[in-house]
Amino acid sequence: MAAIYDALFIFMPIVVLIGLIIVWSYFSPKRVVIYEYERGVVFHNGKFHRILVPGAYWLLQRFDTLQRVDVRARFITIPGQEVLTADNINVKVSIAASFQVNDPLKALTITSNYSESLYMILQLGLRDLFSSSPVEELLAKRGELSKRLFETTVEKVSNIGLTLPIALLSPRT
């Protein structure tokens, strides 16, 4: 009987230690670093929890999911779009735009890919702008077209969490 107690004294701490290691690995926190040029969006069990600003954080890896969002200014170009004017004349135009993520939560949750959404918003804004005017009017107000495109798309872009500081049109031959 004494041999059984001796075995328990030897193996019981090992079993407890193994159990603690298993529990610790299940609930262990994970250290993450958010850099100056990004923001982190934390979802706890699939629901929005908080936005992380630059710094170091501890997250529970079993319950928390981190999505990183780059908030640096980026550029997008839409080359050579052929657009019909109101008088059915084809015009080839390119767009160059600068954008930046303003609201990381909106950028992640409202659309599946905010870059593609921006591309589509600019493309549709361009088509709306050109299809509503005849070619003579477009040529007469050439300098104003970029401003009008910017005005028509800026609100739609802000709805998906982006800011659009610049949207420029350039005619193509």
How should each PLM-predicted stretch be described?
Residues M1-T173:
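N-terminal hydrophobic membrane-entry segments
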